Amino acid sequence: MKRSPGLWEPLRSMDERAVRRAADAHIQAVASGDVDEAVEYIFGEDVGKARANLARVAEVVTRAEVEDVSIKGPEAIVQFRVETSAPGHPLVRLETVWADHAGRPLLHAGHAIEQ
């Protein structure tokens, strides 16, 4: 809940289409090696650290896509399917948490999903 003058109102739910567009732009930037574009969708992490992490990931990603988007109130859960050239990890699924910042969906956290 957020406070408005004299009122309490629920936090706005995320827009699924906007989240899907942002998530797709992010993962396609990673897959194409455009680290500068990919880092624009990350919130709360040091930009230099995020850029270095994404550069390492981009080296092994061969194809990636948004697999699922589910809205959970003020957050969205986005699952990615990522194909890689990494030995022993040809397919990785990631689950990420996105939230709205000034009207723009940004990635907050993520982890690999056990297969």
Please identify what each model-predicted range represents.
Residues 3-6, 11-15, 20-77:
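Short solvent-exposed beta->alpha transition segments
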Residues 50-101, 109-115:
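Surface-exposed, charged secondary-structure patches
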